[in-house]
């Protein structure tokens, strides 16, 4: 009798487990179909949005060029109004690593398309939520309001003629609303502002290469070429910053960061450490021809410091609250 009860209990548990598995498979299949049915049209919508914002950017750049030419005070700012707790003289005499900037991340972003918003707030809510749903003013307006450090994402995007373009998008699939779709035009926007504000604190632009190792040597060649072409002598390259030093280990050991006074009206590009970092280093291991300085992740410094630290102008500390002792 006892054995019969045990056998019956096992069968019931087995039956229940099969039902649970069946419900899980059914639920996951339904979830997958819902996501798929929304994902495909959303990518199409995102592509159209990218083209719309590309055209918008062309018009905006034309507007800026006309405005700068017509009005000598257009986008001209007074740095003193953005400096708190110190005088302009104090800030200019400080070393670059002794001051803090107001900064924005994904500085080109202007929200989500309707389809992407549905996915992020609905089927993808557990993974994405509202963290990517925000809108910035244009980069020029941010600079006018005192932002002195911005972040741009660089995507290598294939073109119909077999070539490629560098575009500034958070995601070419889903997040394509950008005020700087054409990366070079976005750089031109920044350069026009610097031309109008030659006494500005040095601008810092963090560049994040998207696509992992797909952002390859030819993409970096194109990106560096843009930076040299657009900014010329205003661009603070590793070679310029290092001066007599051979590497940034020695540079940092001597606290050789230049004063803000010597960097007025200049711009520093920082390459955010990603999977393509080794590619960028390999193309110029002596840092003599690169346009961008390298910003290492703090975790990399801790794990692979000996290999990479000599290339690092600075370090990025994400989740800063966990590393208060390092700030």
Task: Indicate residue ranges for each PLM-predicted region.
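Catalytic cores of phosphodiester-bond hydrolases, prominently lipid phosphodiesterases
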Residues: 6-16, 20, 24-27, 31-327
């Amino acid at each position: 009798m006892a054995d019969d009860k045990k056998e019956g209990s096992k069968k019931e548990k087995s039956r229940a487990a099969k039902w649970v598995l069946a419900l899980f498979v059914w639920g996951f299949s339904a979830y997958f179909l819902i996501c798929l049915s929304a994902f495909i049209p959303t990518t199409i919508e995102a592509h159209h949005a990218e083209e719309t914002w590309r055209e918008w950017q062309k018009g905006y750049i034309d507007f800026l060029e006309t405005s700068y030419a017509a009005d000598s005070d257009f986008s001209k700012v007074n740095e003193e109004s953005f400096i708190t707790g110190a005088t302009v003289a104090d800030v200019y005499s400080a070393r670059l690593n002794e001051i803090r900037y107001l900064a924005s991340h994904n500085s080109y972003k202007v929200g989500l398309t309707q389809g992407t918003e549905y996915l992020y707030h609905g089927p993808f809510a557990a993974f994405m939520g509202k963290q990517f749903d925000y809108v910035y003013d244009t980069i020029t307006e941010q600079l006018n309001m005192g932002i002195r450090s911005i972040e741009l994402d660089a995507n290598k995007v294939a073109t119909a003629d077999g070539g490629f373009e560098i575009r500034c998008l958070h995601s070419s699939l889903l997040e394509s609303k950008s005020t700087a779709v054409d990366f070079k035009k976005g750089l031109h926007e920044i350069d026009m502002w610097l031309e109008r504000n030659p006494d500005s604190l040095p601008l810092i632009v963090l560049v994040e290469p998207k696509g992992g190792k797909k952002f390859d040597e030819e993409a970096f060649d194109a990106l560096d070429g843009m930076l040299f072409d657009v900014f010329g002598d205003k661009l603070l390259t590793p070679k310029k910053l290092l001066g007599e030093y051979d590497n940034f280990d020695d540079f940092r050991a001597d606290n050789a960061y230049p004063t803000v006074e010597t960097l007025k009206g200049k711009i520093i590009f920082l390459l955010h450490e990603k999977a393509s970092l080794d590619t960028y280093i390999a193309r110029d291991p002596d840092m003599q021809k690169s346009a961008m300085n390298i910003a290492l992740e703090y975790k990399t410094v801790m794990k692979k410091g000996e290999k990479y630290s000599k290339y690092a102008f600075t370090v990025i500390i994400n989740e800063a609250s966990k590393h208060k002792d390092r700030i």
